[in-house]
């Protein structure tokens, strides 16, 4: 779970850095996601290396700050789109601040916070998050995150007219994964989730491969990688696809909890 939170935080750090640099940090609040995502990434590394079965207050605070930053960022992006001429038109949805992007740091915070709740579970006891079974709760969070990330990818790939057939993968594979996680979350104990586990691995691979496809997309712009300083800003966002990998890792962690604790 800490690795999942860290993967999401790293994606946000790189993506928001590029996009907000392109926007010249016109609003000073645009520095916030960079600072918070860097803190969240460092916190996830600390959590991964910490073997103590006790929640850490500083990690909790950082993860909650990340979640709050995601909510606030969504509000800023909604305002940015709504204030433009035409409001929530296709043109503005395509080219103004991406509505779904800040939710990635929210998800990083939620997954990280869940990891701390699982960590503080006593041996032999069912891991819970606010009295809810931990595995099923995390599966629901990861599934919802996959649907939201699919919506963001679908909007931008629709803008690109799906000119490459592989652009259909991020809008077809993740919803299936979300349904599988929802089924796992709603199902009873003792079920075999082998296919769902395999599908999460497929989504993780898709997220990594997506960064490669985006790198190829950058190379197709005028000047290719020789003109990287311009094309990396205007080409497909390199750090965006790994967010699918982060959510897939969270899904795998949820399935692992349900395997070890059938009632979790």
Language model regions located:
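Short amphipathic, positively biased membrane-proximal segments
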Residues: 1-264
């Amino acid at each position: 779970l800490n690795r999942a939170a860290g993967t999401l935080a790293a994606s946000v750090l790189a993506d928001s850095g590029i996009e907000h640099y392109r926007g010249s940090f016109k609003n000073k609040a645009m520095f916030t996601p960079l600072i918070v995502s860097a803190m969240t990434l460092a916190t996830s590394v600390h959590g991964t290396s910490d073997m103590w079965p006790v929640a850490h207050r500083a990690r909790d605070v950082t993860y909650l700050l990340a979640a709050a930053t995601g909510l606030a960022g969504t509000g800023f992006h909604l305002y940015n789109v709504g204030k433009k001429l035409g409001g929530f038109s296709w043109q503005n949805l395509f080219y103004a601040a991406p509505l779904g992007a800040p939710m990635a740091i929210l998800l990083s915070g939620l997954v990280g916070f869940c990891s701390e709740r699982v960590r503080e579970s006593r041996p032999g006891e069912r891991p819970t998050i606010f009295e809810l079974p931990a595995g099923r709760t995390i599966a629901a969070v990861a599934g919802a995150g996959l649907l939201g990330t699919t919506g963001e990818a679908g909007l931008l790939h629709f803008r690109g007219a799906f000119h490459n057939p592989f652009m259909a993968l991020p809008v077809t594979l993740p919803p299936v994964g979300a349904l599988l996680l929802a089924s796992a979350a709603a199902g009873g104990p003792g079920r075999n989730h082998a296919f769902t586990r395999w599908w999460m691995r497929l989504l993780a691979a898709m997220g990594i491969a997506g960064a490669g496809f985006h790198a190829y997309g950058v190379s197709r712009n005028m000047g290719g990688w020789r003109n990287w300083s311009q094309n990396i800003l205007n080409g497909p966002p390199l750090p965006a696809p790994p967010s699918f990998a982060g959510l897939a890792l969270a899904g795998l962690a949820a399935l692992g909890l349900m395997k070890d604790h059938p009632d979790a």
